[in-house]
């Protein structure tokens, strides 16, 4: 699977354009990226646990073995705007807070089934956030058109960052399927939970990896 096909798969699995995808495709750094963040070993371990919850080790290697956490750190530094970098970092604290509320301890100390429950619980939050973001962008479109019509050259469009967990899911899939472990251990990705496909094509011998939607 080439990078372009992989981006299409990630977009379909996460319901949106891949954040920083154009720079991933071109293999270059986003000129609007913020200052490089110094991710610690603990940060990388946290990203690995999130990714491993999405792609756990089964008969094929998991995301942790594929070093997806390190991939996330590189992509956030090289391909994300400063605004999205900030949202991504704040997402770590948000996941820990959600885990403490649900299970009484940090995400890193949670049992695998509790980690999965925490990440699945974020789906309604994502849908609500994306709806608000869509409305926000529409308002900005209207304001920009009005400014252009009035000849206002001082108008500066405001932006709203992507949801942190969409970023984490996208980077998990990208990181896994660009790793040696992902390329050799799996050939397809079907999100779970995801939309029902009653006649999913399957060929004998196909390897299917499932993960959180």
Describe each PLM feature range:
Residues 56-62:
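Short, solvent-exposed loop/turn elements at domain surfaces
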Residues 49, 67-213:
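Mature-region segments of soluble proteins
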Residues 36-54:
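Post-signal peptide N-terminal segment of mature Sec-exported envelope proteins
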Residues 29-30:
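Bacterial signal peptide processing site
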Residues 39-44, 62-63, 159-164:
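Structural motif
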Residues 5-26, 111:
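N-terminal export signals
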């Amino acid at each position: 699977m080439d990078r372009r096909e992989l981006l299409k798969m990630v977009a379909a699995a996460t319901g949106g354009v891949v954040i920083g995808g154009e720079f991933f495709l071109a293999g270059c750094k986003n000129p609007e990226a913020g200052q490089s963040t110094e991710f610690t070993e603990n940060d990388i371990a946290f990203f690995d646990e999130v990714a491993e919850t999405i792609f756990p080790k089964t008969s094929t290697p998991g995301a942790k073995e594929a070093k997806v956490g390190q991939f996330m750190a590189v992509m956030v530094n090289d391909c994300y705007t400063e605004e999205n970098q900030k949202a991504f970092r704040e997402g770590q604290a948000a996941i820990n807070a959600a885990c403490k509320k649900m299970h009484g301890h940090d995400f890193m100390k949670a049992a695998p089934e509790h980690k999965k429950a925490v990440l699945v619980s974020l789906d309604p939050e994502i849908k609500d956030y994306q709806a608000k973001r869509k409305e926000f962008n529409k308002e900005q479109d209207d304001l920009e058109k009005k400014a252009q019509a009035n000849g206002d050259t001082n108008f500066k469009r405001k932006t709203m960052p992507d949801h942190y967990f969409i970023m984490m899911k996208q980077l998990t899939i990208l990181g896994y399927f660009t790793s040696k472990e992902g390329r050799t251990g799996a050939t397809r990705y079907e999100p779970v939970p995801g939309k029902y496909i009653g006649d999913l094509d399957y060929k004998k011998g196909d390897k299917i990896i499932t993960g959180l939607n």
